């Protein structure tokens, strides 16, 4: 399940009003945390254990395809898709969408279930969606 973050809501308000300096979310990051609960709340600002090593699984905007798709109402969902190719051995357990190559604001956070054990030359295609809808 993906969790929208408070920092993401702030940036969405900037986008909606044209105030401040809103930046588009074009970066996808992967992490390896295995602790219970990880970052499963709206106050999260980072992945719990983001991979920052240059091994094909680090945060990037290269190759990330961002689009809008339909879930309930036409074009109500932002979607990011990226295929990562590993040059290392690790298990990916979490992912997030950011608006900067490091730091920045995290819009959504999600835990992978099942997790993705990776070895060199493995690929992982990840799709992250964020639907905009009224609270229920």
Placement of each model-derived feature along the sequence:
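Small cysteine-rich, disulfide-bonded extracellular modules of the LU/uPAR three-finger superfamily
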Residues: 1-93, 99-136
């Amino acid at each position: 399940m993906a969790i929208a973050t408070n920092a993401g809501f702030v940036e969405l308000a900037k986008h909606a009003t044209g105030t401040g300096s809103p930046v588009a979310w074009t970066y996808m990051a992967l992490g390896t945390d295995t602790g219970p609960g990880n970052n499963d709340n709206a106050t999260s600002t980072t992945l719990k254990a983001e991979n920052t090593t240059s091994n094909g699984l680090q945060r990037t905007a290269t190759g990330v395809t961002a689009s809008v798709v339909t879930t309930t109402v036409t074009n109500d969902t932002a979607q990011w898709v990226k295929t990562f190719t590993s040059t290392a051995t690790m298990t990916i357990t979490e992912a997030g969408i950011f608006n900067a190559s490091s730091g920045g604001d995290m819009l959504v956070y999600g835990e992978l279930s099942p997790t993705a054990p990776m070895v060199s030359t493995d690929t992982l295609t990840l799709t992250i969606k964020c639907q905009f809808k009224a609270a229920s």
